[in-house]
Amino acid sequence: SLVVTFFPHPGKLTHPDKIQLIQTLNQRLDEISQYQVDMALIIPFDRKFSEISPHDFVTGILHTKLHAEHVIVGSNFKFGKNRSGDVNTLKELCAFWNICVHLVSPVTLNHEHVSSSAVRRFLSAGRIEKANEYLGKPYAIRGRIIKGHSRGRTLGFPTANLFPENEILPKGVFISQSTLDGRKYRSLTNIGFRPTFQSGRGKDETVNVETYLI
C-alpha cells in the first residue's frame, strides 16, 4: 500500500497567503507511519505539475509509474489542471486501466462536514477544543527550543521558548502536553504576545510560544 501526498500544499501555489497548513510535512509523515502503510510518496507540487491534465495524471502516474490497482480518495477529490477532474473523471479514466476507485464518504459532525477548512477556522479563532474534536486528536505544535529573555526563570517559573514550525498558532493559554527528548510532560502553554512584559515600543509584536513544564 502507498499513500501519495503533495508538498507544498497545492493551494500554496495559487493562494500562498491564504492557505495555512494544519501540519508540518514531518508531522504528516509521522501520522502516516502510524497506519499499516508500506510507504509514502511525496510528489513535489510545482507549476509544471499543476499543468498536468487528469488523463496524464492517471495514465502517466497512477498506471505507468505507480502500477496502481486500487485508488482510494475522498468523495470531493479534485485533480488535474485547474482542478478539472473529479471522482467521476477518475473512475472513467481508471476503468480503462482496470484500476478500481474507492470513495471515502464525508464525515459529518454537528451537521457540518469535517474538513481542513473547518479545522483551520477553529484554530485561527483559538477554539482548540472544537478543533481537537474535528481532528479526533489534540492539535500539536512542533519546533525547537530557543533561548528567551529568562524572565520566567527569574520569577521562579522557567519556561521553554519554542520556535514553531507550524503555520497556525492559535492565541491563548492552554493546558498542554509537551514531549522533550522522548519524555512527556504536563505543561501550560501560552501562544501570543507576551502577557506581562512589553518592549520599549509597546507590546511585543512577535507571536511567542512559551511552555511551562509541570
PLM regions and their residue ranges:
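Phosphate/ribose-recognition catalytic cores of enzymes acting on nucleotide-derived substrates
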Residues: G148-I214
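Core alpha/beta nucleotide-donor-binding catalytic domains of modification enzymes
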Residues: S1-T64
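Classical nucleotidyltransferase
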Residues: E51-P158
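Short secondary-structure boundary segments
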Residues: P44, S75, I191-F193
